[in-house]
Amino acid sequence: MKREGRKIAGVVVWDTATARVADRAGVDIVSVGDSVAMSLWGRPAEGDVSVDEMLLVCTAVARGVERALVSCDLPGGSLDGARRLVADGGAEMVKVSGEELVAAIARDGIPVLASLSGDGDAVTEARRLEAAGAAALDFRHSGEEDGRRVADAVSVPVIGGLGGGPWLDGRMRAVHRLLDDPLAAYVADVRAGRPVKGD
């Protein structure tokens, strides 16, 4: 998609029904985030989740997807965990941090969405992760200038969460963050006695 100049739209979801809605909407990547621990289960830390739990969530999400690519965060950082998410969970890509782990998983033939750490020089890190075999880069919480420099420095897509500017190759958002305005509009329509979608 980067070569074609088409931006990548991604959403983070944790269940079959939402995955189905995202897939029908034309999302390119449905990402199963380890944020499930905090956002869905109310745990105190975002990464407080096991491979077995991610496997369960990934399987549910994959059941709702017919077209989009399913990516899954890999807790624990093991090659065996990545293999399980692909073989048993329906993931087509895994998201990890760290050059060595990216290289090990990529050598095994599994596409990797590699997270930039945000420590040090982002361009150098991005080039190293691409050289290690990353199929795409996750660059969150970046400024616009850093986003442009990283996107220009590598041939793989650079997908941003918060920040990064229009130069990034795509965006990833947790689906619940996209619901604020539509949900508020729904409440306003109901209270005003107006028809709502689905009536």
Question: Which residues are covered by each model-predicted region?
Answer:
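Alpha/beta enzyme core
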Residues: 1-199
